[in-house]
Amino acid sequence: MRLSTSMIYQQNMQGIINGQATWQKTGEQLATGKRVVNPSDDPIAAANVIMLDQAQSENSQYTLARTFAKQSMSLEESILSKSTITITSALSEVIKSGGTINDDNRSSIAASLRGMKAELLNMANSTDGNGNYIFAGYETDKTPFVEGASGIEYQGGYQAISQQVDSSRSMTVSHIGSDVFMRATGGAKTEPDGSVQADLFESLDIAINALETPLDGADDATKESVAAAMNTANRGLNNSLSNISSARAELGIQLNEIDNLDAIGKDRDVANKTTLSQLQDTDWVEAISSYMMQMSSLQASYTTFQNMQGMSLFQMK
């Protein structure tokens, strides 16, 4: 088969152009550190990279969500821990008042309980660093506990704040105040009539009112009424302690779970990054070797082409 001068020229030029493209592509891989820069480089790998990028983005979002959840639960746990100490002190005062003490001592205990009530009310109305009420549910701009005509009333939201902390796990990260300070657990101590004294602030009010009732020279009916009230306050405070302990236990379990999910998330992050690297990152040894070989081959092609241009064949009309 006879080849025309133009065909030989075109074939050599095309070879050089293809060689340049391959060399430049390898250079791009070295410059970016990526083997797959465009989907056309490796369509299957590119599709897998997109899916893994999405998985990484989701994993990062859940990691951030767990950080916020942990902060919220840790703050609530801290407040409930302090509340437990105060309630325990109040219960101790109530028990102490059951002894043989005079009205002055009883009034002093009542004043102490008033101070503890104010302290607990302040804790129940705690805010986070952004001014959001912790125990108000989703109505974070509302003061959850206010002094009403009949005592402390709850006016916050009635839906606890939940957080999606993993693809298949959502948890309560902040309890509503009424569930914490005005409820009792299933095993609560009952009153003689079968009811349950569960409202923490009401229990304190019962004790305060009873302690402020003079007993020096009082009749038996009054003394019995005061004793019954103090027993009710005692049971109520015990119920509040149990209920808050239950909430704290739930928080503790969930905080441990958050730590476990964080560990899983870190493992997932490492696995995804490893797979992404295998799919798209440049193999430096192979790429550098290919780059040098392609450059040498291209230089040889240039030299050959230039030499051929000097031959008479290319000068023929």
Report the location of each language-model feature:
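Amphipathic alpha-helical polymerization modules
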Residues: M1-T140, N209-K317
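Cysteine-poor, low-complexity segments in flexible/peripheral regions
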Residues: E139-T222
